[in-house]
Each structure stands twice: as structure tokens, then as C-alpha cells.
Amino acid sequence: MTKSELIERLAGQQSHISAKTVEDAVKEILDHMAITLADGERIEVRGFGSFSLHYRAPRVGRNPKTGDKVELEGKYVPHFKPGKELRDRVNIYD
């Protein structure tokens, strides 16, 4: 599901709220989450999961076209850990 599809679905379920209002709310939430992570903070949504940053250590990679070695710097990447309730809801193959 894309962000646009999410906005459409939410707006369709909430007929008393305009699509523009839903779009603004979704964008505001995502912007605030990005800012919070950029500040090094963790985000926890009970029953859904948590977002945090994980550090990727520097390493040697390879250019896929040439095969040359490339030094990759260490960096922080966003990480999502689903909560138990979400894991249980999506575990339909038991």
C-alpha cells in the first residue's frame, strides 16, 4: 500500500473528513516521525510496533558494474520492530 492508497482508504472510511484533511494529517504524522528519528529518539506505537535507528558499521562493498571495492561509511538506518499484537494479526499461516 502506498501513501496515496492509505490516504484514499482513510478518506473513504471517514466520509465526514475531507481527503485533503486526511492527506495533511498523514503527512504531518510521517514528517513528525522522521524528525523524531533524526533526533535519535525511539517511537513506540503500542500494539503496532516501534521505530528506532540501528547503526550499520563501515564496511567494504563492491560496485556491481565494475566489481571494484568501495569503502562504505558507517550510517544509521531506520528499523521497525513489530509489536506482538501486529505479529499476531498478520500471522495468518498458522
From Swiss-Prot:
The keyword Phosphoprotein does not apply. It holds the Pfam family Bac_DNA_binding. One of its GO terms (cellular component) is chromosome. One of its GO terms (molecular function) is structural constituent of chromatin. GO terms for biological process: DNA recombination; regulation of DNA-templated transcription; regulation of translation. Keywords: DNA recombination, DNA-binding, Transcription, Transcription regulation, Translation regulation. InterPro entries: Hist_DNA-bd, Histone-like_DNA-bd_CS, IHF-like_DNA-bd_dom_sf, IHF_beta. CDD domains: IHF_B. PANTHER family: DNA-BINDING PROTEIN HU (PTHR33175), INTEGRATION HOST FACTOR SUBUNIT BETA (PTHR33175:SF5). Heterodimer of an alpha and a beta chain. HAMAP family: IHF_beta. Belongs to the bacterial histone-like protein family. This protein is one of the two subunits of integration host factor, a specific DNA-binding protein that functions in genetic recombination as well as in transcriptional and translational control. This is Integration host factor subunit beta. It comes from Photorhabdus laumondii subsp. laumondii (strain DSM 15139 / CIP 105565 / TT01).
